[in-house]
């Protein structure tokens, strides 16, 4: 069975999330999030135009998506759409840093929305 796609791809959904979503800034990363009625949490990793180098952008994107995929259990049956805007100072981020950042974000969101 094919795993569901965890990416947000619709331009309308992305614009709506930027407008209506809640906002957190953590360590050079802006996070927009909104609870959703879908049966899956989704993610979009994007970068400002000043972030040059496709190889670095794609590496950061892969790391974020993999960490997010492994952190599904922390959301405890709550489904959230996330947009991560990653700035150039986080270009050399490693897997364990991203894992820690995502755990902190999920814990913060769950505390805030209990």
Curated annotation (Swiss-Prot):
GO terms for biological process: tRNA 5'-leader removal. It catalyses: Endonucleolytic cleavage of RNA, removing 5'-extranucleotides from tRNA precursor. The keyword Nuclease applies. The keyword Metal-binding does not apply. Its EC number is 3.1.26.5. It comes from the Bacteria. GO terms for molecular function: ribonuclease P activity; tRNA binding. Keywords: Endonuclease, Hydrolase, Nuclease, RNA-binding, tRNA processing. Belongs to the RnpA family. Consists of a catalytic RNA component (M1 or rnpB) and a protein subunit. RNaseP catalyzes the removal of the 5'-leader sequence from pre-tRNA to produce the mature 5'-terminus. It can also cleave other RNA substrates such as 4.5S RNA. The protein component plays an auxiliary but essential role in vivo by binding to the 5'-leader sequence and broadening the substrate specificity of the ribozyme. This is Ribonuclease P protein component. It comes from Borrelia hermsii (strain HS1 / DAH).
């Amino acid at each position: 069975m094919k795993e569901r796609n965890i990416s947000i791809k619709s331009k309308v959904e992305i614009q709506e999330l930027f407008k209506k979503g809640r906002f957190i800034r953590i360590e050079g990363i802006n996070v927009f999030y909104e609870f959703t009625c879908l049966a899956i949490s989704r993610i979009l990793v994007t970068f400002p135009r000043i972030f040059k180098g496709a190889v670095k952008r794609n590496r950061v994107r892969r790391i974020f998506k993999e960490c997010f995929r492994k952190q599904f259990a922390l959301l405890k049956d709550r489904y959230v759409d996330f947009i991560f805007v990653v700035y150039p100072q986080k270009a050399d981020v490693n897997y364990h840093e991203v894992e820690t950042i995502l755990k902190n974000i999920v814990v913060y969101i769950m505390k805030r929305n209990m």
